[in-house]
């Protein structure tokens, strides 16, 4: 007896090797087990047998043949993985909707809200709110746990997200993210003062070798020919908006959208996001309630109508209140 698990590749994992994707999708699975399954033909990619060296595209469909757990074997209980006891339920949570039509909606996510359910976060997420607001009219090709979610921002990051109401719209938006045609602008306040008024950070990001729960710039993954192996290419453009004593107000544009990208890149330059308890200083000069990072603007092509759309959100109170406490830096 066996089960098949259906997986859809999200935009942020486009370009990833299939064995690494499987390992991240199924934490119980080791890399060697994933490669074994691929060698045994247990994984299909878009309807054809997958190869162990295949790299994935956003929206690609994986079908994984999972063995049934047998007492005495070391295989995890895949039945529990496939059919968890609970799935996200609709919850009447207020949404700040910036735009909505029959195919998609753009929401302004508040700080402290998790985007989708995960370990320790089964309620109060954006997905729970979307399930209440949209009901059955929500893209589910990426699973009910990520219903409607096209891209993510961190729990303690506020700002704009586009969500898909149907699978066709999801795939159209995911393709734009993969092709870097979605405009994503953030504003942040960082510790310290960047030397240049504007610049580009082009450094690969992967799991930290010191702490697997964190991300890090991985220069060791850069190959002589300029390609990246074992991490993911990440590009962040920044512009200084104003300098303060001990802090800098920045506008950032994402060319790629890797996990914690802005936070990791700026921390690597020695200017971590103010209030970032993961990548910031252990003893910051100012204590904040979470990180000062806001997804300020979002632009994309409507996946159905073809119209180019652009949205902006005001800086939230926590951000502007912090700015008012800072002392502008005198020009040298």
Enumerate the language-model features and the residues they cover.
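RNA pseudouridine synthases
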Residues: 1-332
């Amino acid at each position: 007896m066996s089960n098949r698990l259906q997986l859809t590749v999200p935009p942020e994992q486009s370009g990833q090797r299939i064995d690494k994707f499987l390992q991240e999708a199924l934490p119980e699975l080791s890399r060697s087990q994933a490669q074994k399954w691929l060698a045994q033909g247990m994984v299909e990619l878009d309807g054809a047998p997958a190869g162990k060296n295949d790299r994935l595209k956003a929206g690609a469909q994986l079908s994984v043949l999972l063995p049934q757990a047998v007492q005495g074997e070391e295989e995890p209980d895949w039945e529990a993985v496939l059919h968890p006891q609970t799935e996200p339920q609709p919850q009447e949570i207020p949404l700040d909707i910036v735009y909505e039509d029959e195919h998609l909606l753009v929401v302004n996510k508040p700080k402290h809200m998790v985007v989708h359910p995960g370990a320790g976060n089964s309620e109060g997420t954006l997905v729970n709110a979307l399930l209440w607001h949209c009901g059955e009219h929500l893209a589910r090709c990426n699973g009910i746990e990520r219903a409607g979610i096209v891209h993510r921002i961190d729990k303690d990051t506020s700002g704009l997200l586009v969500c898909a109401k149907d699978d066709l719209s999801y795939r159209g938006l995911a393709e734009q993210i993969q092709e870097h045609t979605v405009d994503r602008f953030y504003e942040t306040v960082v510790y310290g003062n960047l030397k240049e008024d504007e610049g580009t950070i082009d450094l690969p990001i992967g799991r930290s070798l010191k702490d697997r729960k964190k991300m890090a710039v991985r220069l060791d993954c850069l190959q002589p020919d300029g390609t990246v192996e074992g991490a993911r290419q990440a590009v962040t453009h920044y512009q200084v908006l104003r300098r303060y004593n001990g802090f800098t107000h920045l506008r950032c544009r994402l060319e790629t959208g890797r996990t914690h990208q802005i936070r990791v890149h700026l921390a690597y330059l020695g200017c971590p996001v103010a209030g970032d308890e993961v990548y910031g200083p252990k003893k910051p000069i100012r204590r904040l309630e979470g990180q000062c990072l806001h997804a300020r603007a979002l632009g994309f092509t409507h996946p159905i109508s073809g119209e180019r759309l652009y949205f902006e959100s005001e800086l939230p109170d926590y951000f502007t209140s912090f700015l008012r406490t800072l002392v502008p830096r005198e020009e040298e």
